[in-house]
């Protein structure tokens, strides 16, 4: 997304708010070999999955009978790097939408096993939509830790425009700012990010039409 905005002429100051680290998953092979569906909510979940697959000394044959569902185009592309095509990609890029599509595939068969690979601090929406209709296992695949870096002094107490791709980005960014600092215009990737922004000193919030980097870039360009 940064490269795309720079190509369009934007002057970008990246601020690193988090560090993604994969989690070593105990008994990984046993957890996934019987899965009917494997679900990823982000590209980081995909990366952690294959990291653990390698640690287990296994390969793709371990999950030969599984089907795959993902949230978002970026997640779909990351999975495709491993020569796997996602079976379900909801048009609305949210966990709630994915839960709805998965439930239509399952019907009344509550013995279907679904493994969700997501962040340790992930939103519960996807789990909530599935826990009553299948054998569900939510696996903490990675953690997004605070990046202890300083905000560039050139930013000062007023940020004219800032782009946020998750609610955790919002919380960590404002934690790094001086107490009296504010953001003039914030661009949000989705509802949860917007809700987090509403709790802080932001004059204007513009939310993308759908939860994708492409839609977020379009929102920024429209404002410009």
Language model features with spans:
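Signature of uroporphyrinogen-III synthase
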Residues: 1-224
């Amino acid at each position: 997304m940064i490269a795309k905005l720079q190509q369009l002429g934007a002057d970008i100051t990246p601020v690193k708010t988090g560090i993604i680290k994969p989690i070593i998953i105990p008994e990984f092979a046993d957890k996934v070999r019987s899965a009917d569906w494997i679900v990823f909510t982000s590209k980081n979940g995909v990366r952690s999955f294959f990291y653990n697959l390698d640690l287990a000394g296994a390969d793709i044959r371990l999950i030969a009978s599984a089907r795959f569902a993902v949230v978002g185009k970026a997640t779909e592309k990351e999975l495709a790097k491993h020569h796997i095509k996602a079976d379900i990609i909801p048009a609305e890029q949210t966990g709630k939408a994915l839960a709805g599509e998965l439930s239509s595939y399952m019907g009344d068969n509550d013995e279907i096993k679904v493994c969700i690979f997501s962040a340790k601090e992930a939103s519960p929406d996807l789990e909530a939509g599935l826990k009553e209709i299948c054998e569900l296992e939510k696996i903490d695949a990675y953690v997004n830790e605070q990046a202890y870096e300083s905000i560039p002094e050139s930013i000062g107490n007023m940020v004219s425009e800032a782009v946020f791709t998750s609610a955790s980005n919002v919380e960590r960014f404002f934690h790094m700012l001086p107490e009296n600092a504010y953001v003039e215009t914030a661009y949000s990737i989705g509802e949860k990010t917007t809700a987090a922004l509403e709790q802080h000193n932001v004059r204007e919030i513009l939310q993308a039409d759908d939860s994708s980097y492409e839609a977020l870039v379009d929102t920024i360009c429209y404002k410009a």
